[in-house]
C-alpha cells in the first residue's frame, strides 16, 4: 500500500497551556489498498452481483481507497480545591473511508465517537471518570456483509498513584457491564 496524506493540526491554547483545543482534519488517498471483493468460486471470477446477508467467498485485491476525517481534542481546568485539581479532557473522532474502485465503504471503520473525562489530581493520585460514546454504524463494507451495529455509551473509572520511580494503575472498563458491539 502507498498512502498520500494531507493533514494539518490547529492548536489553540492558553499561554501557560492550562487549557488547549486541537483540531486535525485529514485526507488520505491509498494506492494498492488491500481490500476484499466477493468471488464466485464456480466461475473463478468476481461475482457479477453482490450477495448480501449470506456467506460468500472473498478474495483480496489491490484497489484504490480514500479516507478523510477530523480529530478534535481538548482539555481545561475546572477547579482547585482542598480535594485537588479537577479538569475536563475530551476527544472526538470522525473517519469516512471508501473504496474508490467499487464505491463500497471500507471495512472496520470506527463510526463517530467521543470520550469525555472528568479528571482529578491530588497528592500523587491521578483519577478519571470517563464517558465513551459511539454512534451506530450503518454504512460498512457491503462486499464483506459488514453488519450494522447500534450506538452505545460506556463509563470507565481509572485511578493511578505515582511515587518517585513507580506508578500503579487501576481501572474498571465498562463499569456498568453494558453489552456493545464494535
Q: Which residues does each PLM region occupy?
A:
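Outer-membrane beta-barrel translocator domains and adjoining extracellular loop/strand segments
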Residues: 1, 33-40, 95-107, 138-146, ...
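Residues that define the transmembrane beta-barrel architecture of outer-membrane proteins
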Residues: 2-6, 64-70, 108-114, 151-155, ...
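Membrane-embedded beta-barrel scaffold of Gram-negative outer-membrane proteins
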Residues: 2-57, 66-68, 173, 180
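Outer-membrane beta-barrel channels and translocator barrels
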Residues: 3, 15-17, 77-83, 122-125, ...
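Transmembrane beta-barrel domains of outer membrane proteins
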Residues: 9-13, 24, 73-77, 117-121, ...
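Gram-negative outer-membrane beta-barrel transporters
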Residues: 25-30, 47-139
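C-terminal beta-signal and adjacent terminal beta-strands/loops
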Residues: 29, 36, 135-139, 160-182
Amino acid at each position: 500500500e502507498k498512502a498520500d496524506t494531507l493533514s494539518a493540526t490547529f492548536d489553540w491554547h492558553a499561554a501557560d497551556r492550562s487549557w488547549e483545543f486541537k483540531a486535525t482534519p485529514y485526507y488520505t488517498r491509498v494506492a494498492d489498498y488491500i481490500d476484499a471483493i466477493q468471488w464466485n468460486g464456480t466461475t473463478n471470477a468476481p461475482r457479477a452481483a453482490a450477495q448480501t446477508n449470506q456467506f460468500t467467498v472473498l478474495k483480496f485485491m489491490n484497489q484504490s481507497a480514500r479516507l478523510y476525517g477530523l480529530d478534535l481534542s481538548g482539555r481545561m481546568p475546572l477547579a482547585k480545591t482542598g480535594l485537588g485539581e479537577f479538569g475536563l479532557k475530551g476527544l472526538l473522532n470522525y473517519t469516512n473511508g471508501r473504496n474508490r474502485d467499487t464505491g463500497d465503504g471500507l471495512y472496520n471503520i470506527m463510526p463517530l465517537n467521543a470520550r469525555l473525562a472528568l479528571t482529578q489530581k491530588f497528592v500523587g493520585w491521578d483519577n478519571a471518570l470517563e464517558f465513551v460514546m459511539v454512534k451506530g454504524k450503518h454504512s460498512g463494507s457491503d462486499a464483506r456483509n459488514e453488519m450494522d451495529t447500534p450506538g452505545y455509551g460506556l463509563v470507565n473509572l481509572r485511578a493511578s498513584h505515582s511515587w518517585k520511580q513507580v506508578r500503579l494503575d487501576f481501572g474498571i472498563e465498562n463499569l456498568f457491564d453494558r453489552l456493545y458491539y464494535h
